[in-house]
UniProtKB/Swiss-Prot annotation:
Descriptive protein name: 7-carboxy-7-deazaguanine synthase
Function: Catalyzes the complex heterocyclic radical-mediated conversion of 6-carboxy-5,6,7,8-tetrahydropterin (CPH4) to 7-carboxy-7-deazaguanine (CDG), a step common to the biosynthetic pathways of all 7-deazapurine-containing compounds.
GO molecular function: 4 iron, 4 sulfur cluster binding; carbon-nitrogen lyase activity; magnesium ion binding; S-adenosyl-L-methionine binding
Residues bound to substrate: L29, Q30, G31, R44, T90
Key words, A-Z: 4Fe-4S, Iron, Iron-sulfur, Lyase, Magnesium, Metal-binding, Plasmid, S-adenosyl-L-methionine
Ligand binding ([4Fe-4S] cluster): C48, C52, C55
The encoding gene: queE
PROSITE patterns named among the record's database cross-references: RADICAL_SAM (PS51918)
SUPFAM superfamilies: Radical SAM enzymes
Chain segments carrying region Disordered: 133-153
Binding site for Mg(2+): S57
Naturally occurring in which organism (per UniProt): Halobacterium salinarum (strain ATCC 29341 / DSM 671 / R1)
Amino acid sequence: MPVSETTDRQASNGGDGPALPINELFYSLQGEGKLAGTPSVFVRTSGCNLRCWFCDSYHTSWEPTHATMSVDDIIAEVQSYEHADHVVLTGGEPLLHDDAVVLLDRLAALGYHTTVETNGTIHRDAPIDLASVSPKLASSTPTAETDPKGDGEWAARHDARRIDVATLGALADDYDTQLKFVVTDPSDMPEIESLLAEIRTATDTRIGDEDVVLMPEGTTHAELDARRNEVATLAMEHGYRYTPRLHVALWNDAPET
């Protein structure tokens, strides 16, 4: 079950020590990107500085829910999954939280391989093995027509915040990085190409086409079926990687997958 449904918000806080707002903590397979198929513990924080209309973790952004868990308790829960040595810190936007660095430091000291899934608008100095950076394209903006709450109130804020080229460049300079783009349809490609050119100019690190990942938007079998082949074709045409959403293919839209 999601942590927020099983843990008292204050009881797990551990006093004044480092803690994070945790929406879910579970064991599954990494479903996306270079490490797809890897057994992983997912630590999902709540809270985000953006509002993608298609957000697949609605209760970390549009209606955030969480339990406050101490870093000690998070580590204990991670260690209870004995077959996983890979931890995915995700959200929401996990790098919003100062104590994400404390958690990553602790995980590194214990020998875990870590992926941080981020929208690329925040940089922190932390031991991150793979920065899975998903810049948000214009097609993610919650207009009045696509806003799940129906009013488009977040459109201007989201659009103003969604791309920070300097931060994207800094992440690429400091970490092993994959750039993962959520593709809604072929009209996203010109923006992807333009943004890639800007990021490559902003970094001293080579970003190869093999570091660019195209992923179809969708959280159900039906939604992925409608886009999968089209996005795979785009990946081949441009020389980029294609990633499935393996967890959706296996478990549809079930929670904690």
